[in-house]
């Protein structure tokens, strides 16, 4: 297999990890097609990685301690109560628990992974792929300029709107879950009374029909940023094409959604957390419809899917970036074994599909527990919330599950 001509579609975290995995297994003729021509590192949202998964990914050579991060140690659950005011600006604390995660800024994390990809790998920004297809002796990739190139292997790392997925699993479309994630991030120095909120704490603020997760992430060039993700149903009414993967573009949140968010925080948030959300500027706010999808199979004889192209799990799982990096380690391990390419891809898919199915199931379970079937949070105390969480994450998979053991250490690049 080494020496084959390979295309990676998508140049973000999954694409960089895939290119690194391929290069380590002797595939040095690699072209990465990235549809955007802008600077990917400008994306400034948060990424959280469970400490256990970090240890595995660091051992595999995909993460390391030098990558700028913030360590979280606790998770604090808050709900608005009748006395949530100046004397209790954070609201009623329902529960405090251990929360061993590292948080990253997507942009710097991507830069670190991009820097690990050997210089011999060709990156083509602004190369939008429009179609992929398998042939009897290879695979074809067509780009927006009308060019069609032949490769021995295509790896689809092009996200939840994947074009490559259609060549592997025709007709599979991510299913809309019925609600949204509002996201925002901004410099920490904008935060008033920041001392009220421990930088090592992830806050879960719950309200009727949803919740928001808030934590700090590293700044793009130093300092820290406030990062938050709020999950709830959109307001009723026309003009919101949220049942399609082509929903509202990031960064273009219309008046209806902004007003709905403001009304929600005013009605249901303790004062401090409402202020945290309200300080987000329009250009820092975007909306992400929630979807589920699992490509099974996720490979053909010459094409493989990785990351969100293969598995779309809701972010409640706390394992989005982890899943992409785990897929890369599994692809690397399968290609190392020296089997024929179709057999190697089949072995990769078996391991990937098992992890992906677990994450999709967890995302659905947590989506029901936290959003569409959320309890009356006001009635829960510490013990009741602990029992509720154990039921919601019955498999104990929050933050990702353990990657199957590698048979040998990663090779130097």
Regions found by a protein language model. Give the residues of each.
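C-terminal helical "tail/cap" subdomain of flavin- and related membrane-associated enzymes
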Residues: 2-3, 65-70, 87, 299, ...
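Residues at the starts of beta-strands that form the adenosine-phosphate
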Residues: 5, 28-31, 225
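Conserved mid-domain beta->alpha element of the FAD-binding
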Residues: 7-25, 155-156, 280-365
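Conserved Rossmann-like nucleotide-cofactor binding loop
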Residues: 14, 38, 161
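Glycine-rich FAD pyrophosphate-binding loop
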Residues: 23-43
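Active-site-adjacent segment of FAD-dependent monooxygenases/related oxidoreductases
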Residues: 38-116
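Conserved FAD-binding catalytic core of PHBH/FMO-like flavoproteins
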Residues: 83, 100, 110-267
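FAD/FMN-dependent oxidoreductases across multiple families
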Residues: 216-220, 232-317
């Amino acid at each position: 297999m080494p020496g084959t001509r390979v295309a990676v579609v998508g140049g973000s975290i999954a694409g960089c990890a895939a290119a690194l995995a391929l290069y380590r297994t002797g595939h040095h003729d690699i072209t990465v097609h990235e549809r955007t021509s802008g600077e990917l590192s400008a994306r400034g949202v948060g990424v959280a990685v469970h400490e256990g998964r970090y240890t595995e990914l660091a051992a595999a050579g995909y993460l390391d301690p030098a990558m700028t991060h913030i360590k979280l140690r606790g998770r604090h659950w808050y709900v608005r109560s009748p006395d949530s005011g100046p004397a209790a600006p954070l609201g009623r604390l329902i529960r405090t628990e251990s929360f061993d995660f590292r948080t990253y800024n997507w942009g710097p994390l991507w830069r670190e992974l991009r820097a690990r990809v050997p210089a011999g790998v060709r990156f083509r920004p602004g190369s939008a792929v429009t179609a992929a297809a398998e042939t009897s002796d290879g695979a074809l990739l067509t780009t927006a300029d009308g060019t069609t190139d032949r490769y021995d292997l295509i790896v689809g790392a092009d996200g939840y709107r994947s074009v490559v997925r259609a060549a592997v699993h025709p007709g599979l479309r991510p299913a809309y879950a019925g609600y949204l994630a509002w996201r925002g991030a901004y410099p920490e120095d904008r935060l008033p009374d920041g001392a009220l909120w421990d930088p090592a704490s992830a806050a879960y603020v719950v309200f009727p029909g949803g919740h928001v997760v808030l934590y700090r992430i590293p700044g793009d060039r130093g300092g820290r940023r406030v990062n938050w993700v709020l999950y709830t149903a959109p307001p009723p009414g026309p003009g919101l094409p949220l049942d399609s993967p082509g929903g509202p573009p990031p960064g273009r949140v219309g008046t209806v959604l902004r007003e709905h968010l403001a009304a929600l925080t005013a009605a249901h948030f303790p004062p401090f957390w409402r202020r945290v959300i309200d300080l987000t500027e329009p250009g820092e706010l975007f909306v992400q419809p929630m979807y589920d999808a699992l490509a099974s199979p996720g490979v053909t004889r010459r094409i493989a899917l990785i990351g969100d192209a293969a598995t779309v799990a809701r972010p409640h799982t706390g394992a989005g970036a982890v899943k992409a990096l785990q897929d890369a380690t599994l692809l690397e391990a399968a290609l190392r074994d020296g089997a024929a390419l179709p057999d190697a891809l089949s072995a990769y898919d078996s391991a990937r599909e098992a992890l992906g199915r677990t994450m999709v199931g967890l995302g659905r379970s947590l989506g029901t527990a936290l959003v569409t079937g959320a309890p009356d949070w006001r009635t829960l105390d510490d013990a009741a919330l602990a029992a509720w969480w154990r039921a919601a994450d019955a498999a104990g998979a929050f933050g990702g599950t353990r990657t199957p053991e590698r048979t040998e250490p990663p090779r130097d690049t």
